[in-house]
Regions:
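Short glycine/proline- and aromatic-enriched beta-strand/turn motifs that initiate or cap beta-hairpins
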Residues: 22-79, 237-239
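Residues that define the transmembrane beta-barrel architecture of outer-membrane proteins
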Residues: 35, 51-57, 82-86, 116-122, ...
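Repeated loop/turn-to-beta-strand initiation elements of outer-membrane beta-barrel proteins
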Residues: 37, 65-73, 96-103, 131-137, ...
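Residues on the lipid-exposed face of transmembrane beta-strands in outer-membrane beta-barrel proteins
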Residues: 43, 57-63, 88-94, 122-130, ...
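Transmembrane beta-strands of outer-membrane beta-barrel pores
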Residues: 43-49, 75-81, 94, 105-113, ...
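Predominantly the C-terminal beta-signal and adjacent terminal strand-loop region
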Residues: 187-239
Length: 239
């Protein structure tokens, strides 16, 4: 009998904590009311069967106009692959009950210099975010210019899921993810599996990192076997 009582009390406490978190959680990628600008830089390392070891950098700048609207621009360089990329994204944030939703439109351009190939990508997505997890759904249009020929793939489904060990309000966290996209690529059905972490020093500084494994067939790796990549970087917010 005592075991049943303790179980019921534990469930009630868990429900209460979850409800409180839903009320006070303010979104992982939202305007905090103070810092309108956000910049990040990260170092990328990896290896695949075609180009061997590779190294590169990502740069991002994000501006929050208010609690709803933001714009994000980024650049990517992977030196061994001779891959250069640029992207721009606009995002609208709104709340439905306890869910934070982010509707976004994005344009991405990648130039594979070694293979004389250009890639143009347009994406529309919506992301559902809670304190311990987030889900993304959308659609991508991917076009290639290869040696004078142009090819456009059919509309591709964008999907992703991410879950964290601790609530996002915590100063540190570890998570697991699977998705068919990353900072500078969108795939068909090739899923990117990985884990990530962050450590928030204060409201302005945050360190983050990821470790990913991708299967064969990825245009962005141009390989016939899996690729492993690691990423570590810093985010800085200011007024």
């Amino acid at each position: 009998m005592r075991l049943i009582q303790r179980s019921v009390i534990s469930l009630l406490l868990a429900f209460t904590a979850s409800t409180a978190l839903a009320q006070y959680y303010s979104g992982d990628h939202t305007y905090d009311g103070e810092h309108q600008n956000e910049a990040s830089v990260s170092l990328i390392t990896g290896k695949n069967i075609i180009t061997g070891p590779c190294i590169g950098n990502n740069w991002h700048y994000k501006h929050y106009f208010n609690d709803h609207w933001s714009i994000d621009v980024g650049a990517n360089t992977q030196y061994t692959k001779k891959l250069y990329g640029f992207k721009a994204k606009g995002e609208y944030h709104f709340i439905i009950q306890a869910f934070h939703l982010f509707a976004s439109g994005e344009y991405m351009f990648n130039h594979y210099h070694r293979f004389n190939t250009n890639e143009n990508v347009g994406n529309l997505s919506i992301r559902f975010e809670r304190g311990y997890w987030d889900l993304a759904l959308g659609a991508s249009m991917i076009g290639y210019n290869l040696m004078g020929d142009h090819y456009t793939e059919p509309v591709t489904l964008t999907f992703g899921a991410h879950a964290t060990l601790r609530p996002r309000t915590n100063n540190w966290n570890v998570g697991l993810l699977f998705r068919n996209y990353d900072d500078f690529y969108y795939e068909n059905w090739n899923i990117n599996w990985g884990m990530d972490f962050y450590y928030r020093f204060n409201p302005q500084w945050k360190m983050f990192g990821e470790f990913n494994i991708r299967p064969s067939g990825s245009m962005s790796q141009l390989a016939s076997k899996y690729e492993t990549t690691g990423k570590v970087g810093l985010i800085y917010r200011w007024k």
